[in-house]
């Protein structure tokens, strides 16, 4: 049985079901597995995506039945992904794009957030829990819609999503504001993503709020990547990318493959670290940042400084200064809950921390880094389209730019393409040298005409949908929202 414990308290031990149902540990730590399971990579590479997902996920979720996981992954990664779950597209030479935006909401978050509601419902069954689950989600754009789509009308669950007002693309905002479902709510928060995320974390850490909700038979949980249930499905597509390179004869088994990941909250790239620790021949994990390059600075110097200027960029899902999942990596590298707790205390109190030189050296064994300016992002979108005929969004362009700097001769580079270019039509259109209309839907149409590509139907359909949610609150209001729920 795989056990999980908190990054800040090694003695706080839970099962996978408990980790997924609870989300965050009581003292604010994140749940991590006690060990990295070793797998038969060659055998896994023979499997189709749903079967591969069941095999990888079952290594960690050992208190779930294998039959349940097989059925859950089969129903999740089939029709909804249009036959393109974990699809690897050749771009140029031995650089590839792992297209993770063929799911229902056109972003990589679908891989976790379409499966995670099934995992939560089953976790409650495993634990014989009957309370209502209130899920609070802070989002910089894609997680919000992914979570709303996954959890809407799930029995026994209520979900409230908080996004920074003006901090997403208009398409991302409309995806959330038009969400259907009787159990969903969406709020714009004054401030940036970190304000929203801090507000949500504060509610999770408030024992008085938990007690009041418990009186009404309500328990809090998270759908952000601080929840283990968000992270584990993302490990799968690293194996899928490697398998496709094998099948295409681009590598022989055992060859290393590098991955470049556009990174905000550090969850997507951390999943690659887990894949590597499980035995997948991952070479370098390249962390690509936008102008909010706090992670590039940390991976270069060992000092994490969240107190810095915040930039609103064309890649809003990465406009993050407090990168939550880095805490998990720090735990795995140091092995010390006390050390991690101390670092997080420093971050909370002073806005920064510095790791020991040997800790940074251990991290650099697996990770590299780089960042892209706004000008470089636009140039990369245009270059990829004009040179390779490859149309990408702003976040993917951040990674393509960094990947080109970090490419090793003879080692394939897989860039994780995290969102459809049609989620950010104005930015992509302008990067291609066109004047973008103010309206996102007109821009979407213009992008279709300019490139001959078709926008995903779910995005085009937003134009006809009525907006349901328009409330704007201060970060302090997140607690009031939580306390407003009744069983």
Where would I find each of the regions flagged by the language model?
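PLP-dependent amino-acid enzyme catalytic core
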Residues: 1-487
């Amino acid at each position: 049985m795989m056990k999980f414990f908190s990054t800040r308290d090694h003695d706080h031990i839970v099962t996978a079901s408990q980790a997924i149902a609870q989300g965050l540990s009581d003292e604010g730590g994140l749940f991590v597995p006690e060990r990295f399971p070793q797998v038969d990579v060659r055998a896994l590479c023979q499997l189709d995506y749903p079967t591969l997902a069941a095999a990888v996920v079952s290594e960690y979720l050992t208190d779930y039945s294998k039959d349940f996981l097989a059925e859950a992954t089969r129903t999740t990664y089939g029709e909804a992904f249009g036959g393109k779950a974990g699809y690897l597209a050749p771009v140029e030479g031995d650089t590839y794009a792992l297209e993770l935006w063929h799911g229902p909401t056109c972003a990589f978050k679908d891989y976790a957030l379409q499966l995670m509601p099934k995992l939560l419902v089953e976790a409650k069954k495993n634990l014989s829990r009957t309370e209502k689950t209130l899920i609070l989600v802070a989002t910089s754009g894609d997680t919000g819609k992914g979570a709303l789509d996954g959890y809407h009308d799930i029995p026994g669950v209520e979900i409230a999503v908080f996004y920074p007002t003006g901090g997403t693309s208009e398409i991302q905002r409309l995806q959330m504001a038009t969400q259907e479902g009787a159990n969903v709510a969406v709020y714009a928060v004054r401030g940036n993503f970190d304000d929203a995320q801090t507000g949500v974390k504060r509610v999770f850490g408030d024992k008085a709020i938990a007690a009041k909700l418990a009186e009404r038979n309500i328990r809090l949980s998270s759908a952000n990547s601080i929840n283990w249930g968000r992270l584990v499905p993302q490990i799968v597509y690293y194996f899928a990318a490697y398998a496709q390179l094998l099948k295409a004869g681009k590598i022989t088994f055992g060859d290393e493959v590098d991955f470049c990941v556009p990174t905000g909250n550090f969850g997507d790239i951390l999943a690659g670290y887990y894949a590597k620790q499980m035995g997948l021949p991952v070479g370098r994990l390249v962390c690509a940042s936008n102008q909010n390059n706090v992670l590039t600075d940390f991976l270069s110097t060992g000092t994490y400084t969240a107190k810095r200027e915040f930039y609103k960029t064309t890649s809003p899902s990465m406009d993050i200064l407090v990168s939550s999942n880095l805490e998990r990596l720090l735990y795995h590298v140091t092995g010390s809950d006390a050390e991690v707790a101390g670092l997080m205390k420093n971050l909370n109190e002073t806005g920064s921390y510095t790791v020991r030189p040997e800790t940074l050296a251990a991290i650099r064994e697996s990770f590299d880094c780089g960042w892209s300016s706004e000008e470089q992002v636009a140039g990369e979108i245009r270059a990829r389209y004009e040179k390779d005929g490859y149309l990408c969004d702003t976040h993917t362009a951040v990674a393509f730019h960094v990947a080109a700097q970090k490419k090793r001769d003879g080692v394939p580079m897989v860039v994780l393409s995290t969102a459809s270019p049609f989620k950010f039509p104005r930015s992509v259109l302008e990067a291609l040298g066109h004047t973008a209309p103010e309206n996102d839907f007109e821009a979407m149409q213009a992008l279709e005409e300019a490139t001959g590509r078709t926008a995903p139907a779910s995005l085009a359909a937003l134009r006809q949908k009525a907006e349901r949610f328009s409330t704007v609150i201060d970060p302090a209001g997140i607690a009031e929202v939580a306390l407003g729920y009744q069983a």
